[in-house]
């Protein structure tokens, strides 16, 4: 029997951080048809503070990857708070990963793998891996 995403979260002992409040005039989530669009998320820690730093200057690529994973946990917390039920999510369709990095940093796909690997672990290989863009923001 296939495990539900909520069961996988418990099995791999993940803790979701608090869902952040909107920092401007936007909806954290919008449902259109059978698609759920989620506004940009940051890497919120369990204590509610943000992970900060620029990859290639303050953070290594590996630390950036951990921050991208934390963005995934923050996104799941936002879904749970506003949508109530993570198990209603059927698949990841598209990921736009934006890496706060130096101009010289080029390992954006490696960093965003932190997010993608988490989604795969929660939703499974078939449904947790979608289309993806990984870009750097300086």
What are these regions (language model features)?
Residues 1-138:
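Short, polar/acidic, helix-capping and beta-turn segments at strand->helix junctions
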């Amino acid at each position: 029997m296939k495990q539900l995403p909520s069961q996988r979260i418990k099995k791999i002992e993940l803790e979701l951080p608090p869902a952040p409040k909107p920092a401007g005039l936007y909806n954290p989530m919008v449902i259109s048809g059978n698609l759920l669009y989620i506004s940009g998320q940051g890497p919120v820690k369990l204590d509610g503070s943000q992970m900060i730093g620029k990859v290639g200057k303050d953070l290594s690529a590996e630390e950036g990857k951990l921050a991208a994973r934390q963005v995934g946990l923050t996104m799941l917390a936002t879904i749970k708070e506003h949508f109530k039920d993570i198990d209603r999510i059927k698949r990841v369709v598209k990921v736009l990963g934006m890496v706060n990095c130096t101009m010289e940093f080029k390992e954006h796909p490696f960093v965003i793998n932190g997010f993608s690997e988490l989604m795969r672990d929660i939703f499974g290989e078939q449904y947790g891996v979608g289309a993806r863009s990984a870009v750097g923001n300086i």
